[in-house]
UniProtKB/Swiss-Prot annotation:
EC number: 2.4.1.16
Upregulation: Expression is slightly lower in the yeast form than in the mycelium and shows a maximal expression in the log phase at about 14-18 h of incubation. Shows a late increase in transcription at the stationary phase in both yeast and mycelial cells. Highly expressed during the stage of white tumors of plant infection.
One Gene Ontology CC term in the entry: cell septum
Protein name: Chitin synthase 8
Annotated glycosylation sites: 164, 364, 390, 546, 1076, 1650, 1770, 1794, 1882
């Protein structure tokens, strides 16, 4: 035995120091001995970073298992060196011999080899305990290692420190029967590092399985999964470029492992498909495209989105919405957060992490379902946690939790070694054998982290639960405040990212953690969008889905299954159980560790004892109980707290086991073999406390028992038979032990005697137990069988198939896969499907197979088992043999075209989506005609080609695309027509002529000198230069002398060179005439033949060719008058083909030429002087000045002769062309364009005159009309909305007569906002943040069930700069089941909320609950009857209104009763924000002062902007409804918006369409522009936003034009009505691109030097902009001239690019889920996924009926409370006719007593009397301000059911309003002639619904200045008053109808009250239909008694009221 082997244990070293331990470890390391024993229960392992030779081989394992089986002491004398195999064998030995559960714990730094040591220990235990081949449980020998390999592939990755680092904590329990046979296994996972899925560090890898799959999948599988190129996946990072060469082989091994544990092929394919979906998910890119959506990001690569959606079994649209929107529960309301590109990327990563972590949990639970047993006896647990982490880039929650686990484990080990048996040893009196050793105790560090309350984890969790009030910074402050003085804690400065940090001194080292997003990570939740999208909402059997939000989930059952696991905790909406509002994946394992009942301590199991049934082990799922309690207390489960709880439970379990520690060391930091660095190893020796533990465990006793137990157990041991120990008790037993100790020669180190117990070391215990084992015949037999099996395996040379050093050649894994199953054979081989068990069964076909049932160690429910583990994706049980597969086989081979989808794959999303609803709608004839025209225009584009484009899959979208193309073609045709008219038509009618009249020609002298030669005009100015070059002797002046002159005489011609005569031959001596030129320069150009000294016959022709090519500018032109003048001179001229010929000389010479021979020569006598045909000459002579074209062409001449004669005419006699420029057709062509131009300029001129207003804005008088200021809000910022609300509050108008009506369109958190928009609005208004009114139903716009919407109503008073204005806030929150953008239906729907309400108020129509509550709030809380309001001021949430605007608007209405709507000037508040806004300043200005001012002259402003306009609700005289007329409301509320036209009208330009409807239905009324009213709005400052805005504006303009065309009176008289002008104006929008092109043409024309300047066009353009400049000057808007210049520069953008872009993107909007197809008979079938809408879901009731019911009940409760009461009443009594609302699913309140809209649970709001004569809320309320006084009649017990804002009463009759007046007599309707004086309070309900006393002092508003006298009532007074009221029948609680409160003894109210009621009824009635009889009937019904005695009085009063109105 070597010296190294003699070192038995470190604890036995003579000098135990870190240095000596280091020396021993180093020497053994270099000797190839990585294992060293510290004591019997602690093993030290040094990671060799290389194969350990045969130290971990199967042969070595057999040596140690053989040693375990060996019971002969002599044969075991050669002790084997320490090894993990021996460690595992010892644990198994103790479990078998003591019956006590064991645990093997691996501790150490990362990269110290813990995972491999754990695998080896597991392997040894399996080898010791697995059943022999062919026996039940034999396949566990393959299945458990396979399961371990699967989890390793899913949970391990390559890091910088370790190539196979565990990224989760793994605790595995091997389960054994009482005979020690392995029967099952259970693995618990602790804290998977799921962030690695999306953000692995540089040079590190993602989880192994991704790389295995990408490298090892077959080509077919890669094709199916789309994973060809690993480097293309963002989630694989740079590490994908350095793929492990063994990854491919490991993937085959992984598939084999899945097969071994019983996973079906579909299961494995599904897992790979999810992994592929995650990889592709990481490649989805986002960009901030604000053209499509207002604030959210869009997908940049939709093809990747489609692929991911297909793999996940969902639609692409649903996935896109889930990625770009985020649903969050804020204050009990589901809100949607619009994500920008960064937010969407983070959300995408969250989905990837959630998918992977849930997949991991599902796989682990599946393995547990297949392997875990319930009926086991003992277990051995193996724990491996990730190593300690301290990152350089910053540590966060992941590192905190991992280090906390390491800290906890280290503390557990220290407690086990140093403290666990301290008290026991002291009690037994053997403390001297276990000396106290000082050691570094980390208990304080652990207390710092876990103290309850106040520990770091507790603080972290508490702060996370209170977000957003608490932040990372407040958490750090809390840390410092609580632990600032702790030695292990320090708050550090801000890190590099600017976030605070804190440092914890761990046992290993100090680690600094950043606080960045720590709270957010600690409260990490799974997005409910993803859960709802992929899991779906379970539906009750047999019920149809009628709600769009109830998603059916993924079509792939596997995807639904992983989201249905127990690990995912969900929270449902309080009002809808099927709506998930919160989901979290617990970091706790799905199962709990196995625990024992009490009495399972360190007692020894008796031999040969049979356990009774009541002594069976049991498991307790303590985690479930903890989870249940936690979920009740806190909705947010925090990661750190959950993890701590899981660890505590685990350590509690380990506390009950016998623990075996393996301390793993890392020899160096570089993962290099054969390197043992002193610094690294010594640091770990010190950290782990090896020297201290070695000294402590000098004497280690493994087993203790009483003396009686010792004697009883070992009485039959052969070595101790002489001692005779049987039946020894008490003192005798102690003596017997002493004797036995002497017999066995044990020292104190091996066995020691205590006070009542015996303590044995491992050596002594093994020695005694071996003798017992040797005497056990059954164990001897089993050991012999096992030894034979080992021998057979050794002979076959089998190896560990899952060893990291195993052979991984592809041919090996693919061809010899059966060898991997080990000595136990393939458990699935030669098994028929009949004999095979279901997937997940434990045994394989034996008759005595144990049935696997759910383990009670697991908390998994049966539901989960049924949902998740019933055999693959099909949902049916799967047999292994039927779906088993070879690793090399394509796992997707049999999936078919639909893949893993449950239904028809992705076709399900394009053809028949689940839950789709079909509705048939009619098609108008106009629509049919337009569709026919569209097809006629676009027939040449086949539909099958369009359908190949991703965005044109649906037929209705393709049809819209065709419509867009058709419209574009029509627009382009109109533009082409405009071009034709401008450019082509003139030339077509009058072709352009390049001719000059003699006058024009003569004028060309000087710089532009022209000259003429034989009718052709040349540019003499340019000719001079070239002539000077050729003939320099001739001065330029001599040449320029011919400017404007005919130069023909100086260019003599040679006749025979230019004319071939009649017969083709002309004598050279023949000349044109005998005339000699008198010009001296002619001689220089005379080269005729008779100049024999220099004859050049062709010189003239050549010169003319040169001149024509370079200098000709035209021809001489002669008009008819000019030709007549020539004829008057006796010249013979004629016109041929537009050319004028003069043959006068030829005729004068006798129809022939003249002869001229050279000097000294005579011409031949027979020379023929004729060269022209006599017939032609005769024709000219006979037709002087006429056109002889036809006659000449018809002459009987040979064609050759005729051609010669034409040439002769052209060369010799041409004098010019006929000038047609003044002909009628040319005049027409000229003046038609001028007329059109003048017409357009005239319109501009009228606009100019309209804009000329010299009057000064005067201050209007104060008016008393009631006005509603409507403000729709969507996602605007807080600052914008605050400015708008403040500007409306500050309007110089009576505050009591204006109402802020704010509609919040959905619970949406806009980009850049930290709260949902409704919360921002309410915070601005100062509403009570604790106020939670119930949501009430109303009818909304939307498809299907989305028409049922819900809203909350808030009301109060808003105070700003001395103004106190009442407000109503309508918060559209949607039904509880809505997830995406709850409540959001668009701006049009927000406008309709008020329009529909006012329409129903006017006509007294039944109202829905929301409208009734609005009515109540306005009438009974604010104190104004809704029918009093006459005007609606519409203002956008980003607009500020000038203070005097409202008064001026109303003045305009009052001046002209025909005005139905008007607008003011809207300027820019951000004019200089960017170049984009600068371009818009001038355009905004002229759109008002030119366009709208001009239209206003005709009373037809065609576009009243929604941002700043005002409408008249009804006519002032006849009370006819105008803006709220039913026809306008019905048209504007069009719900079917499914065509291109309606989309552009109602989705892109709703404001303009509203104006169109007003003009359409009320053509005789006016819409005007009021220049004195001004507002400021925010213009787009980004190019993309501007592009989107103008696209919507331009397209809506075009489509509104189509609507206006059919407006009656459009044509008017002679097409000169205003609407024709509007048509021309709108038409100019279409041809705007042509206008720009024309302007560019003009500019080019002007810039061209030789171009003629179009003076008229330039003058008109100058006039256009000059007039505008005049307007600016007159209005002193000097800066506008500069803005005009900026605008002119941007004309190409406004008039060219934007229109063209807009026209082509006319169909660029969201189409939603609605599809339109054609039915069988041609009808239109609308398909959508929004479910069906049942109108009966929304109850309706008239206000009168509702108010009567309230009278009957004498209740001031809100609508919600009444509905709740009705529901309860209906349940008990059944429904009854005429009752209040029927029960509504969405109308019920959360709590029965919680009244709507401001009901306070306590009387905290009644304490201070307000200035309005009632009780004002406390500090910070929305009412504010108070006066001195006290109130009477204050009853606290009733305060809970009163409205917080019901200042002055509720429903109880004439309730006091906010201003202290009875609502029906408020503001303008005097009560009994007393004006604003209040009525006696004995007939008016108080604030809380009780009669009030007469006020002592009247307030300015009619209430009590000093409150309601009398002070607060005492308890006795309250009781007395209540009794009196009950006696009078006023409480309403008795159930019977009680008389109205104002009733007097005689049964009828007072006359004054009757007058008030008459006025109220008349105000609510339609005067065109109401009669006196009907009014009396209403009064009689109201008073519930006969009114005959008052009939005359009532009739008289009715007439008085009508006469007043």
């Amino acid at each position: 035995m070597s010296a190294l082997d003699e070192v038995a244990k470190l604890s036995q070293l003579t000098n135990i120091t870190p240095d000596t331990i280091f020396s021993v470890l180093r020497d053994r390391f270099y000797a190839g001995l990585p294992y060293t024993a510290l004591s019997d229960s602690i093993l030290v392992s040094v990671n060799p970073y290389a194969s350990s030779g045969n130290r971990n081989s199967d042969d070595t394992l057999r040596e140690y298992t053989s040693d375990y089986r060996q019971t002969n002491k002599q044969l075991r004398a050669a002790t084997l060196p320490p090894h993990i195999f021996a460690h595992a064998c010892n644990a198994y030995f103790y479990m078998r011999r003591t019956g006590q559960d064991q645990s093997l714990l691996m501790a150490g730094d990362t990269s110290s080899g813990k995972s491999e040591v754990r695998r080896l220990a597991l392997r040894a235990l399996i080898d010791l305990s697995v059943a022999p081949p062919g026996k039940k449980g034999s396949k566990l020998g393959v299945q458990i290692p396979s399961a371990e390999y699967i989890l390793e592939a899913l949970g391990n990755s390559r890091t910088l420190e370790n190539s196979n680092a565990s990224r989760f904590g793994k605790y595995t329990e091997l389960q054994f029967s009482d005979s020690g046979k392995l029967v099952g296994a259970k693995t618990l996972d602790y804290y998977l590092e799921k962030n690695r899925v999306v953000s692995a560090a540089s040079s590190e890898r993602n989880f192994h399985i991704f790389h295995y799959m990408v490298a090892g999948a077959s080509d077919e599988e890669k094709q199916y999964l789309g994973i060809h190129d690993a480097a293309s996946f963002r989630y694989l990072g740079q590490a994908s470029r350095n793929m492990d060469t063994q990854d491919a082989a490991k993937f085959d091994r992984l598939k084999l492992a899945f097969k071994n544990v019983g996973f079906s092929k579909r299961n494995v394919a599904s897992i790979c498909q999810v992994l592929a979906a995650i990889l592709h998910l990481g490649n989805i890119e986002f960009h901030y495209d604000r053209q499509r959506t207002q604030d959210s990001a869009t997908i940049r690569n939709p093809e990747v989105l489609d692929k991911v959606a297909e793999y996940l079994g969902i639609s692409s649209k649903s996935l896109e919405e889930a990625l770009t929107y985020k649903t969050k529960m804020i204050r009990n309301e589901v809100c949607t957060i619009l994500l920008d590109a960064d937010g969407a990327s983070d959300h995408r990563d969250d989905l990837a992490k959630s998918l992977y972590s849930l997949l991991f949990a599902w796989v682990n639970e599946s393995l547990n379902e297949k392997l875990c047993r319930d009926d086991f006896d003992t277990f051995i647990g193996l724990l491996d946690l990730p190593g300690f982490q301290n990152l350089s880039k910053g540590n966060s929650l992941d590192q905190f939790c991992v280090n906390f686990a390491c800290e906890n484990l280290h503390r557990f080990m220290l407690r086990s070694v140093f403290e666990k048996r301290r008290d026991e040893f002291a009690d037994e009196g053997i403390s001297h054998l276990s000396p106290e050793v000082p050691y570094f105790d980390n208990a304080e560090t652990l207390r710092l982290m876990t103290n309850q309350p106040g520990g770091l984890i507790h603080i972290m969790d508490d702060q996370a639960r209170r977000m957003p009030k608490k932040t990372d910074q407040t958490m750090i402050e809390a840390f410092g405040k609580r632990w600032g003085n702790h030695p292990s804690f320090k708050v550090g400065p801000a890190d590099r990212s600017g976030f605070s940090s804190f440092t914890i001194s761990h046992y290993n080292s100090a680690v600094t953690y950043t606080s960045e997003n720590l709270l957010e990570k600690n409260s990490e939740v799974v997005s409910t969008d993803f859960v709802s999208l992929l899991r779906g909402n379970p539906q009750e059997s047999g019920k149809l889905r009628n709600d769009s939000s109830q998603s059916s989930g993924s079509t792939i059952p596997f995807i639904r299954g992983i989201f249905n696991t127990k690990v995912l905790k969900t929270q449902s909406h309080p009002k809808n159980d099927q709506t998930i509002v919160a989901a979290q994946q617990s970091v706790k394992p799905m199962r709990a560790p196995s625990t024992r009942r009490p009495n399972r301590g360190n007692t020894i199991k008796r031999t040969n004892t049979i356990k009774k049934a009541d002594d069976d082990d049991s498991d307790e799922d303590a985690a479930d109980a903890a989870d249940a309690s936690t979920s009740k207390k806190n909705a947010v489960r925090c990661v750190a707290g959950d993890f701590r709880g899981a660890l505590d439970l685990l350590l509690e379990t380990l506390e009950d086991t016998k623990t075996w520690f393996t301390l793993c060391l890392r020899p160096n930091d570089n993962q290099l073999p054969n390197q043992f660095e002193a610094r690294v190893v010594k640091q770990q020796i010190t950290t782990l406390g090896l020297s201290e533990m070695s000294r402590k465990l000098l004497n280690e006793y493994s087993v203790s028992m009483t003396y009686e137990e010792f004697c009883q157990r070992y009485a039959d041991v052969p070595s101790l038979q002489a001692v005779q120990m049987r039946d020894a008790v008490s003192g005798e037993a102690k003596q017997k032990f002493s004797a036995a100790r002497q017999v066995m020669s044990w020292s104190d180190q091996e066995a020691v005697s205590g006070r009542v117990k015996v303590f044995l070391s491992h050596t002594a215990f093994r020695e005694l137990e071996d003798e017992l084992r040797a005497a056990d015949a059954e164990e001897v037999k089993n050991n012999e069988k096992r030894a034979q099996l080992d021998a057979d395996a050794a002979a076959r040379g089998e190896s560990d198939p899952f060893s990291p050093v195993a052979v991984l050649a592809d041919d090996y894994t693919r061809s010899r896969s059966n060898d991997f199953v080990g000595a136990y054979g393939d458990p699935f081989k030669e098994r028929s499907s009949v004999a095979l068990p279901l997937v997940g069964r434990g045994a394989a076909g034996n008759e005595d197979d144990l049935e696997e049932v759910k383990s009670q160690y697991s908390g998994m429910s049966g539901t989960l088992a049924r949902h998740s583990f019933v055999g693959g994706l099909s949902g049916a049980p799967s047999f292994v043999a039927s779906e088993a597969y070879a690793p090399s086989r394509n796992m997707f081979a049999d999936m078919g075209k639909n893949g893993l989808n449950e239904k028809a794959g992705t076709a399900a999303f394009t053809e028949e989506p689940l839950g789709e609803v079909a509705e048939e709608v009619g098609v108008s004839s106009t629509r049919r005609k337009w569709v026919a025209l569209t097809w006629a225009i676009t027939f040449w584009i086949p539909s099958f080609i369009l359908s190949r484009f991703r965005s044109l899959k649906r037929p209705d979208i393709r049809m819209a695309w065709r419509e867009k193309l058709a419209i574009n073609l029509i627009i382009w045709f109109i533009c082409a027509c405009a071009v034709f008219v401008i450019v082509v038509l003139g030339n077509l009618i009058c072709p352009k002529q390049h001719v000059y009249s003699p006058t024009e020609f003569a004028s060309h002298k000087g710089d532009s000198s022209f000259t003429a030669i034989r009718g052709e005009v040349f540019d003499l100015s340019n000719l001079v230069a070239s002539h000077k070059t050729i003939v320099p002797v001739v001065p330029a002046n001599s040449i320029l002398a011919y400017a404007g002159e005919d130069a023909t005489p100086i260019f003599p011609v040679q006749v025979n060179a230019l004319c071939n005569g009649v017969d083709g031959n002309v004598s050279p001596w023949v000349q044109l005439s005998n005339e000699n030129s008198t010009d001296k320069h002619a001689q220089y150009h005379d080269f005729r033949s008779y100049h024999i000294d220099d004859a050049r016959p062709d010189w003239y022709y050549e010169s003319m060719w040169l001149l024509r090519s370079n200098y000709r500018v035209g021809f001489m032109g002669y008009t008819t008058d000019g030709i007549r003048d020539i004829l008057s001179e006796g010249r013979a001229v004629a016109i041929y083909r537009g050319d004028i010929y003069d043959v006068s000389d030829y005729i004068k010479q006798g129809n022939q030429g003249v002869l001229r021979a050279p000097d000294g020569f005579q011409a031949p006598a027979n020379t023929n002087r004729k060269f022209m045909s006599d017939a032609i000459i005769s024709l000219i002579a006979q037709n002087p000045g006429k056109d002889i074209t036809k006659q000449l062409d018809n002459l009987p001449l040979d064609p050759v002769v005729l051609d010669r004669q034409r040439v002769c005419l052209r060369n010799l006699y041409f004098i010019g062309k006929v000038d047609h420029r003044n002909s009628p057709q040319c005049r027409f062509a000229q003046y038609i364009l001028l007329a059109l131009s003048l017409f357009m300029v005239a319109i501009l001129g009228f606009k100019f005159l309209a804009a000329l207003q010299f009057g000064r804005a005067r201050k209007p008088e104060d008016h008393d009309k009631f006005v509603i200021c409507q403000v729709p809000c969507y996602t605007e910022g807080e600052e914008s909305m605050r400015k708008t609300i403040n500007s409306l509050a500050a309007l110089k108008y009576d505050d009591k007569r204006k109402l802020l009506f704010i509609i919040c369109d959905g619970m949406i958190v806009g980009s850049g906002n930290d709260r949902p928009t409704p919360r921002i609005v309410l915070d601005i208004l100062g509403a009570d943040p604790n106020l939670e009114p119930e949501a009430l139903s109303f009818l909304s716009l939307g498809e299907g069930s989305k028409q049922h919407n819900m809203a909350k109503i808030y009301s109060g008073l808003y105070e700003h700069h001395g103004h106190v204005v009442p407000y109503i806030v309508v918060v559209k929150c949607g039904k509880p089941s809505e997830r995406s953008r709850p409540g959001n239906r668009g701006k049009r729907d927000s406008q309709l909320v008020l329009m529909r309400f006012l329409n129903k108020v006017h006509f007294g129509l039944p109202m829905n609950p929301m409208e009734l509550e609005i009515y109540h709030q306005i009438k009974n809380v604010i104190g104004v009857n809704p029918s009093f309001y006459e005007y609606i001021l519409q203002v956008d949430a980003d607009t500020e209104v000038e203070a005097m605007s409202l008064n001026r608007f109303i003045s305009a209405f009052i001046r002209d009763k025909k005005v139905i709507g008007l607008c003011g000037e809207t300027a820019l508040s951000n004019a200089k924000a960017s170049i984009i806004t600068m371009l818009q300043v001038y355009e905004y200005y002229i759109s008002h002062y030119l366009a709208k001012a001009f239209e206003s002259l005709f009373g037809s402003v065609t576009c009243l902007p929604g941002c700043f306009s005002m409408f008249r609700i009804r006519t002032p005289d006849t009370h006819r409804p105008l803006f709220i007329a039913s026809q306008i409301v019905e048209d504007y509320a069009e719900n079917r918006v499914d065509t291109l036209h309606t989309k552009n009208l109602l989705h892109l330009g709703e404001d303009r369409y509203l104006t169109t409807l007003v003009l359409k239905h009320f053509g005789k009324y006016k819409t005007i522009f009021v220049r004195d009213c001004k507002a400021w709005t925010v213009a787009p400052d980004d190019w993309k936003v501007l592009l989107s805005q103008r696209r919507r504006w331009i397209n809506s303009t075009v489509h509104n034009l189509v609507e206006l065309i059919f407006t009656p009176g459009l044509c008017g008289f002679c097409l000169f009505s205003m609407r024709f002008i509007v048509f021309i104006d709108l038409l100019s929008t279409i041809i705007a691109p042509v206008t720009v092109c024309y302007i560019v043409y003009l500019i080019v024309l002007v810039a061209t030097a030789n171009g003629t300047v179009p003076l008229t066009a330039i003058i008109m353009l100058a006039a256009i902009y000059g007039c505008q400049a005049v307007i600016f000057l007159l209005n002193r808007k000097f800066e506008m001239i500069g803005w005009m210049i900026v605008y002119i520069i941007g004309i190409p953008i406004w008039s060219l690019f934007l229109p063209l872009y807009s026209f082509w993107h006319m169909d660029d909007f969201s189409w939603g889920n609605t599809r339109v197809v054609m039915g069988e008979k041609g009808q239109k079938v609308v398909l959508h996924e929004e479910g069906t809408f049942d109108p009966s879901e929304i109850p309706l009731q008239t206000w009168t009926d509702y108010e009567n019911e309230l009278w009957e009940r004498n209740s001031a409760r809100s609508i919600g409370s009444i509905i709740e009461a009705a529901r309860a009443e209906n349940k008990s009594l059944g429904s009854r006719a005429g009752s209040q609302y029927a029960p509504s699913l969405y109308g019920q309140p959360m709590l029965p007593h919680n009244a709507s809209f401001g009901h306070s649970p306590s009387p905290s709001y009644g304490g201070t009397p307000s200035q309005f004569g009632a009780f004002a809320p406390g500090p910070g309320s929305q009412i504010g301000g108070s006066q001195i006084g006290a109130g009477a009649g204050y009853f606290p017990q009733d305060a809970a059911r009163q409205s917080t804002y019901s200042i002055g009463g509720g429903y109880g009759g004439q309730a006091m309003s906010m201003y202290g007046l009875p609502p029906s007599s408020s503001f303008g309707v005097p009560t009994g002639g007393s004006g604003f004086m209040p009525q006696p309070f004995n007939t008016t309900a108080s604030m809380y619904g009780y009669p009030q006393q007469v006020a002592a002092t009247q307030s300015i508003y009619g209430g009590s200045q000093l409150g309601f006298g009398g002070g607060f009532a005492t308890a006795e007074q309250q009781q007395q008053q209540q009794q009196q009221q009950q006696a009078a029948g006023l409480s309403g609680s008795g159930g019977s109808k009680s008389p109205p409160r104002e009733a007097v003894a005689g049964g009828l109210p007072s006359d004054s009250q009757i007058k008030l009621d008459i006025r109220s009824l008349i105000a609510e009635s339609d005067l065109t239909t109401i009669t006196k009889k009907q009014l009396r009937a209403k009064l009689e019904q109201k008073y519930a008694t006969s009114i005959e005695s008052k009939k005359a009085f009532i009739n008289s009063e009715i007439e008085n009221v009508l006469s007043e109105s």
